[in-house]
């Protein structure tokens, strides 16, 4: 399966590409689309919710645009930070929107005791016992691989029928936390995840990018997770 032009969402991509907030850098990537589920009303509604959630993301908050400040910042010790922007605040409006649409946040579907628990999902859609998972990746590239593995494992085990990952475009890497997860470093592994043995499931990646660069906006603040900044 080729991943150069994958997904049925080209029209959606064109719409969000120009609406002024966070943009989709390319058409949605359908890593897995097997059986009847990708054509189901549940999946279509989940896609609609996620696309609307991505479109809610802007910076600075409330401006209706997503602008990144490319100027170097300063670390707590006063040294220059050439990767000045954090990433975790980006997903907050998206998660808030999904929650308003009835998705549960920081949740997992019911799992048998024999199934490995891999940490809560950012959001979970429950359509009368049919579950769809959502992750917005804000960690380093190793974290991005773990997020994809978590989603694929959930599909293989039958815990979820669908999954979404939002990951950042390569164009943002120079302005964000060093080694941030990005589509360029995930793309070579898409055929591996696509080969998962799942008879009736869907897994889609959305690639987000900034609207423009501006040194007139604040840097996106960084948080801490152990020794890592995000």
Where are the language model's segments positioned?
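Short catalytic-loop micro-motif centered on adjacent basic/acidic residues
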Residues: 133-137
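Acidic-basic catalytic patches of nuclease active cores, encompassing PD-(D/E)XK
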Residues: 30-112
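Long terminal accessory regions outside catalytic cores
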Residues: 1-52
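Active-site metal-binding core of divalent-cation-utilizing nuclease and nuclease-like domains
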Residues: 76-85, 91-129, 140-149, 156, ...
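Structural motif
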Residues: 130-132, 162
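Catalytic cores of nucleic-acid endonucleases
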Residues: 138-195
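N-terminal localization/anchoring segments of enzymes in phospholipid and broader phosphate metabolism
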Residues: 3, 9, 15-21, 46, ...
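Domain-level recognition of nuclease-like catalytic cores that cleave nucleotide substrates
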Residues: 170-230
């Amino acid at each position: 399966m080729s991943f150069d032009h994958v997904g049925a969402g080209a029209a959606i991509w064109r719409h969000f590409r120009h609406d002024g907030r966070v943009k989709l850098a390319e058409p949605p990537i359908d890593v897995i689309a097997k059986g009847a589920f990708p054509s189901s009303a549940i999946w279509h509604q989940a896609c609609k919710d996620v696309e609307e959630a991505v479109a809610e993301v802007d910076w600075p908050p409330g401006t209706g645009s997503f602008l990144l400040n490319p100027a170097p910042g300063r670390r707590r010790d006063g040294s220059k930070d050439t990767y000045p922007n954090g990433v975790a605040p980006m997903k907050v409006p998206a998660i808030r929107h999904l929650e308003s649409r009835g998705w549960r946040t920081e949740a997992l579907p019911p799992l048998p005791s024999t199934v490995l628990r891999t940490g809560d999902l950012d959001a979970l859609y429950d359509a009368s016992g049919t579950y769809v998972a959502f992750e917005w990746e804000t960690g380093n590239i190793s974290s991005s691989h773990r997020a994809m593995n978590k989603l694929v494992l959930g599909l293989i085990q039958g815990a979820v029928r669908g999954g979404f990952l939002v990951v950042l475009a390569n164009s943002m890497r120079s302005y964000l936390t060093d080694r941030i997860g990005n589509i360029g470093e995930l793309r070579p592994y898409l055929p591996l995840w696509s080969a998962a043995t799942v008879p009736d499931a869907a897994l889609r990646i959305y690639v987000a990018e900034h609207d423009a660069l501006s040194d007139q906006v604040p840097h996106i603040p960084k948080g801490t997770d152990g020794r890592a900044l995000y």
